[in-house]
Design a protein with these regions (language model features):
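Basic amphipathic alpha-helical segments that dock to polyanions
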Residues: 144, 166-176, 191
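Phosphate/pyrophosphate-binding active-site loops
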Residues: 1-114
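Conserved, hydrophobic alpha-helical core segments of structured domains
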Residues: 17, 23, 131-140, 163, ...
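Conserved alpha/beta core segments of nucleic-acid transaction machinery
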Residues: 101-132, 136
């Protein structure tokens, strides 16, 4: 692949249709890092661009892989690979490195999903069987898997259950060891699903 200095994302995508979308993503990321269009935040935006492009190409439905972790972990080699393209025009070594980053990120994502699934099954088994048809405790638990940091007021409003009912459910999850209070305050207390967050933090 040959990329001109002023090439845009759309032109790279258009001119390299014979290449796999992952290869095009590598070329786009390299070009963005070369142009550095912003005064600040180019690295973060460049890494975000990888995810957005893979989603736009239909390779991802959700942003579930974190390529940034591999790039940060191998930062010296990352910059060396980009510099080598600028120095010699050798895109192949850069594309190979980029594909290694995507492969590593995908493996990490699969591992995290498996851990989250096991955590889900483990904690579901801890929940007492509901005494009523409407299972507020299960509703709160399901909510936690999308919002692992909560406060009682906002959660009760979102789930459309009373403050006292939400407070009781939160207390139960704290007693079961699923939730943990992080504020140690009398009012406006915040609780976190620490085991869930720890899995998400790992590898980021």
């Amino acid at each position: 692949a040959k990329v001109s200095e002023g090439a845009s994302v759309s032109s790279i995508n258009r001119e390299n249709q014979d290449y796999d979308p992952l290869v095009r993503a590598a070329l786009i990321h390299y070009q963005f890092e070369t142009i550095h269009p912003f005064l600040d935040g180019n690295g973060r935006i460049g890494r975000l661009l990888i995810l957005l492009y893979l989603m736009e190409q239909g390779l991802l439905k959700e942003p579930v892989i974190y390529v940034s972790y591999f790039l940060k972990k191998n930062q010296v080699e990352y910059y060396d690979r980009i510099s080598e393209v600028r120095r010699s025009g050798n895109y192949e070594q850069w594309v190979k490195f980029f594909l290694e980053a995507v492969d590593s990120a995908a493996s990490d994502a699969v591992e995290s999903i498996e851990k989250l699934s096991k955590l889900h099954e483990k904690n579901i088994a801890l929940l007492p069987k509901p005494k009523r048809k409407k299972d507020n405790l299960r509703m709160l638990f399901d909510y936690l898997e999308k919002h692992p940091i909560i406060d009682i007021k906002h959660t009760s409003e979102t789930l459309k259950i009373s403050y006292n009912t939400t407070s009781t459910a939160v207390k139960t999850l704290v007693e079961l060891g699923i939730l943990r209070e992080t504020t140690n305050a009398a009012r406006n207390r915040v609780f976190s699903y620490e085991a869930y967050l720890e899995i998400l933090r790992n590898g980021t």
